[in-house]
Amino acid sequence: MPTINQLVRKERKKVIDKSKSPALKKCPQRRGVCTRVYTTTPKKPNSALRKVAKVRLTTGFEVISYIGGEGHNLQEHSIVLVRGGRVKDLPGVKYHIVRGALDTAGVNNRTVSRSKYGTKRPKAAKK
């Protein structure tokens, strides 16, 4: 605990919070162009082929973002919408691609958590 004299001499430092997604420049999402679409393997205890894309954003940053859901239609030069959110077992992946927005198709045959994967509500089955 500083004394009054110490506070007069040198004021308290302001705590600056660091953004977890600096490439978005304080926006909720940003548009970008895929420069490379590929698969990569996760960190040690996990094993899979995770689908990721390198995206050049409108802010000028080039980021690696994760493509969630089963199957995708992305390729080089696809226009995508990128949101924040890291993938714990993929180092360097701090962004997600929004499914069902711009060139990214929603996940087919998805019935639960549809809004997260850009899937429309299925037509009611006729009896």
From Swiss-Prot:
- Report one GO cellular component: small ribosomal subunit
Q: Biological process GO terms, please?
A: translation
Gene3D superfamilies, per the entry? Nucleic acid-binding proteins (2.40.50.140)
GO MF terms, alphabetically ordered: rRNA binding; structural constituent of ribosome; tRNA binding
Extract the InterPro entries matched here. NA-bd_OB-fold (IPR012340), Ribosomal_uS12 (IPR006032), Ribosomal_uS12_bac (IPR005679)
Q: Does the keyword tRNA-binding apply?
A: yes
Protein keywords: Methylation, Ribonucleoprotein, Ribosomal protein, RNA-binding, rRNA-binding, tRNA-binding
Question: List-wise, which residues carry 3-methylthioaspartic acid?
Answer: 89
Matches recorded under PROSITE patterns: RIBOSOMAL_S12
Record's superkingdom? Bacteria
Subunit organization: Part of the 30S ribosomal subunit. Contacts proteins S8 and S17. May interact with IF1 in the 30S initiation complex.
Function of the protein = With S4 and S5 plays an important role in translational accuracy.
Family, per entry: Belongs to the universal ribosomal protein uS12 family.
PANTHER family in alphabetical order: 30S RIBOSOMAL PROTEIN S12 FAMILY MEMBER
Name used for this protein in its record: Small ribosomal subunit protein uS12
Origin organism of this chain?
A: Aliarcobacter butzleri (strain RM4018) (Arcobacter butzleri)
What's the name of its gene? rpsL
